[in-house]
Amino acid sequence: DALPILFAAPVEPVVANAPPAAIEEIADQKLVSALMRLMADERIYRQDNVTIGTLATRLKIPEYRLRRLINQRLGYRNFNVFLNNHRIEEAKAALADPAQAEVPVITIAMDAGFQSLGPFNRAFKADTGLTPTEFRRQAIAGQTADAAEIARSG
């Protein structure tokens, strides 16, 4: 009438018995999370002369591993495309913000981490199909139209 012993041996963590590919996947997910926190919280992409080496050092991993994460796990062609994506997303938010309508495009570009206007304009147009000025005009006009619609319906 004794109860059966369900766990005769100490339970090993699941990771210990996982295949190496699964362990690598878990490690990669943790590194991607840490990388995205650096990008979102610290906005490391804004720093002058940020390199894959400086970022790898911050994450305490070799450069080749960070390069593989950016290329294979996140799907970016290279480190610069990855950085510029974050810079452009910040610039798009600033350009669409009516409170920043008078801020010069060059200021927004530099604040986002670009070193000069030319590379910013090229990267921005490649990403959005619009120049930064066209993007700003459309974004703010769209918000104004949305606000007018809300005012009419309210």
Where do the protein language model's features map onto the residues?
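Short, small-residue-biased leader/transition segments that mark boundaries at the very start
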Residues: 1-3
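Binding-interface segments
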Residues: 120
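Membrane-proximal linker segments that couple transmembrane helices to downstream signaling/catalytic modules
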Residues: 6-107, 112, 123-126, 133-134, ...
